[in-house]
Amino acid sequence: PTAPETGRVKRDLQTMDSSIVRLDGHTGRLLGQWHLQDQRLSLRHLAWSPDARTLGIALQAEHDDTTAKDAAPVLALFDGTALRVVPTPEHIAQSIHGYGGSMAATPAGWAVSCPRANGIATYTPQGEWRGLVPLPDVCPLAVHGGALWAGGLGASLQNAQAVAPLAHPHGA
């Protein structure tokens, strides 16, 4: 957590509570709460699967230890009954540095922008690793017509989860 007067200085990380809660919309009563085992994984951006059955959550690692941060996953999935982290292959996770940016879901699966890795981490709808789609300084993700769009430094990608995404250079 940060405070407005400190800018982006992080404080009280030991009090983090990485969880999803379900509240009664009329009374505010707590109906359920699901926690991640690793309390230093911050739940960030959210996207529903196209069938609205699963919630994808981009994660940001807040570990003091850089080794733990570099090994951290960037995607969690919540199916209404369980919250689980989705592993990222170790050799890829080290380049991501535990930082998931934007989040999107398409019929092809999940996407998490990873600007520190200059790419988009992609997963199947079930959460299995697909690959890292290269795009320098990628951050914003959007879905249009079932296809993933991604914005990065110098270009945007159309249908970014395809075998051959279409690049749209900026300023061209």
Feature-to-residue mapping (PLM):
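Short, conserved, GDST-rich strand-edge loop motifs in beta-rich repeat architectures
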Residues: P1-M16, A58-A72
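Beta-propeller blade signature
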Residues: K10-H26, A71-G80
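Surface loop/turn motifs at the tips and blade-to-blade linkers of beta-strand repeat domains
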Residues: W34-Q39, P87-I96, G131-P136
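Repeated scaffold domains used in trafficking and secretory/extracellular systems
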Residues: R40-A47, S95-M103, P136-G145, H168-A172
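Short coil/turn segments that connect the beta-strands within blades of beta-propeller domains
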Residues: D51-R53, P107-A108, G145-G146
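Residue position within the beta-strands of beta-propeller blades
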Residues: I57-A58, V112, A150
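Loop/turn-rich, solvent-exposed surfaces of beta-rich toroidal or solenoidal domains
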Residues: T88-P125, V138-C139
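Blade-level signature of beta-propeller repeat domains, shared across WD40, Kelch, NHL, RCC1
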Residues: G151-A172
